[in-house]
Amino acid sequence: MCKFKKVDSKVILLTPQELSFINSCIKNYSKYFQDDFAFVPKNIFEIPKILPNNFWLVLNFYNKPMGFVYLDNFIGKETRLYSAELTTCFAKCAWGDFTKYSAKIFLKKCFDDFGLEKIKAQVYPDNFRVKNLLKICGFTHESTLQKETLRNGKPQNIEVYGLYRNYYYKK
């Protein structure tokens, strides 16, 4: 079982342990989801600066933080959102069945709560764990953006994956 704790970036209601967990995930795994231009917090007190409005902490049955997910880069308008981009980060102890289970629940939640038609994910080619997770959840590879950003001072390709609403809601 998993739970999603919505974090309002304007009113941070995270425990010191949760802030520390987020900071640890960013330090350990940011190379898989951030480029050379990303703001990396130096300590837990800077974390609120980077949290987008649609950020959730993923908790297990015992309320232990296992990872975080967030949506940004929405396309559409408030009355009719079309798509959003998904970013995830899970601690190593959550890799495997927990991430598969929580990802499927979260994706359906996104389609239900936001009325989205599409969810996108941008992944570095060497991030095989996330690519496999996306495929298990129904995402398909849509394109590869050549030399899209810089990572460690070198041009970096980004693979784009998409998941459409009809995967969860067959017409």
Residue ranges, per PLM feature:
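Alpha-helix C-capping/helix-to-loop hinge sites
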Residues: 29-32, 93
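Generic structural signal of hydrophobic/aromatic residues within well-ordered alpha-helices
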Residues: 22, 29, 44-47
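Short, positively charged
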Residues: 31-40, 128
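Acyl-donor (CoA/ACP) binding surface of acyl/acetyltransferases
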Residues: 1-25, 53-171
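Active-site rim helix/loop that mediates acceptor-substrate recognition in acyltransferases
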Residues: 36-55
